[in-house]
Amino acid sequence: MADTSDFRNGMTFIWKDDLWEIVDFLHVKPGKGGAFVRTTLKNVKDGHEVEETFRAGAKVDEVRVERREHQYLYEDDYGLHFMDQESYEQFSMPPEQVEGREFLKEGGDVDIVFRADTEEPLRTEVPQKVDLEVTETTPGVKGDTAQGGDKPATLESGATIDVPLFINEGDVVRLNTETEEYETRVSAASTV
C-alpha cells in the first residue's frame, strides 16, 4: 500500500478495479480545508487519461512494473509481435496497447513494461528518437530552400511527418517520437 505522499510520475497503481499510471500530480495545501493531490492518470490498458483528485493521505495499491528491452518483429491479424532480447521469447500484444506503433520498424528496439507479479505486458515505450527512411515525398528542386518551408513525407514505418524541402526519397531522417517532428537528416539517399 502506498499513500499520496508516495505519488511520483510513472507510478502505477490499482484504482477503481483498473491499472492506472500517474502522468502528472500536484500537492495542494489550501488555506482552508484539508490538503489534497490533483492528478492526471492514464489507463494502462487503453491509454485514456482522466483528471482525479485524492485526499492527502489516501491509500492506493501500488503495482510494481519492470521495463525490458525487446525487438519489434512484425504485425499481423493477431497483433504486434516482439522478441525478448535476453531470452529470445516471442509474444504478441494487441495494437491498442502499443504506443507509438507508427514509429516502429521491423528489427527496431522498444521497451515493454510488464506487471512484475503476473508478467503481463502492459504497454510499449518507443525510443524518444528514431531513424527512419523516407519512402515517399515530392522531390526537392534547386532553389526551393531559399524561403525555407516543409513538405509531407511518408516514412518506412507508414508514419507521415513534415520535413524540410531538401529531404528526398531514400534519405534517413531522425525524428522525435514525443513531438512527432523531424529533427535532422541522418544520411542522404545514395545516387547509384
From Swiss-Prot:
- InterPro entries reported for this sequence: Elong-fact-P_C (IPR015365), NA-bd_OB-fold (IPR012340), Rib_uL2_dom2 (IPR014722), Transl_elong_fac_P/YeiP (IPR020599), Transl_elong_KOW-like (IPR013185), Transl_elong_P/YeiP_cen (IPR001059), Transl_elong_P/YeiP_CS (IPR013852), Transl_elongation_fac_P (IPR011768)
Q: Where in the cell is it found?
A: Cytoplasm
Q: Which stretches of sequence are listed as region Disordered? A: 133-157
GO BP terms: namely: peptide biosynthetic process
The UniProt keywords, alphabetically, are: Cytoplasm, Elongation factor, Protein biosynthesis
Q: Name one GO molecular function term.
A: translation elongation factor activity
Q: Which residue ranges traverse the bilayer?
A: none
Name listed for the protein in its UniProt record: Elongation factor P
Gene source species: Salinibacter ruber (strain DSM 13855 / M31)
The upper taxonomy is: Bacteria, Pseudomonadati, Rhodothermota, Rhodothermia, Rhodothermales
